[in-house]
Amino acid sequence: MAFGKWKVVVGILCGAVAVAGLCARAAPQAGGAPRDLFNGKDLSGWHVDAPALDKDPKARSPFTVRNGLLVSLGTPGGHLITNSAYEDYRLEVEYRFAGKPGNCGVLVHASTPRALYGMFPRSIEVQMEHLNAGDFWCIVEDITVPDMERRRGPKERWGTTGDRLRRIANLNDGAEKPVGEWNTMVIEALDDQIKVWVNGILVNHGYNATADEGQIALQAEGSEVEFRKVRLTPITKLSGDAGPATTP
């Protein structure tokens, strides 16, 4: 797998998210420096996929920029998806539940839109739900962790769709800060591995992922969440369990 290659998705086609398989990729472009996926001003480089907007395109988008922050309003349900696909990277996300604690997530290796329940793109979700940050949720993709039966449940019920056991519990439920304070989530995705830290604490490490590249998505899943940093840096190796130094 080539290092530092951004695989650019044709933005116009990706806007037609309701039609699976239309997002073409241009030739890979070399890169290496950290890149802010959120510019602090608008949603350039992203597109919204919210099924409710199919029926009423003038309805309120679940994502906006407010006071320099990217805000997931929580409703209507949907996703904010990058126009580009990425591989071999570190993703730094600074977020907080500004009001009531709730649910949200970061989806990595995202591809086919609305692949599950007519809502969720095919991907691996890194959970941000309050008190469960760092869980993996398998969405028509899969990943393996140590001690799988304890953390996922009986093997015969594992799966990636419908009512199968798709959740893989994190390693530590105590990494989050109190509601209203900023959390830092770091996700490293390299080859078939995904490693996650919350506030410097290792909360998950999976391997044998069934995808190793794709788009990145943020969820609107019922709760208002503010983001002040979404930064991506190419990597060639995973950080140790103590975690990487975050960028200012």
Report residues per predicted region.
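Alpha-helical transmembrane segments and their juxtamembrane interfaces
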Residues: 15-17, 238-239
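C-terminal segment of classical bacterial N-terminal signal peptides
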Residues: 17-25
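N-terminal targeting/docking segments
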Residues: 5-7, 21-22, 149
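Bacterial N-terminal signal peptides that target proteins for export
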Residues: 1-14
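Carbohydrate-interacting regions of secretory-pathway proteins
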Residues: 24-248
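Coiled-coil-like amphipathic alpha-helices with heptad-repeat character
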Residues: 1-2, 20, 30
